[in-house]
Swiss-Prot record:
Coiled coil: none annotated. Myoactive. The keyword Secreted applies. Keywords: Amidation, Neuropeptide, Secreted. One of its GO terms (biological process) is neuropeptide signaling pathway. This is Pyrokinin-4.
Length: 14
């Protein structure tokens, strides 16, 4: 998981 687990999932949820 090299991607920011808070940048690609945050905007998706709101």
């Amino acid at each position: 998981a090299e991607l920011p687990q808070g940048l690609w999932v945050r905007p998706r949820l709101g």
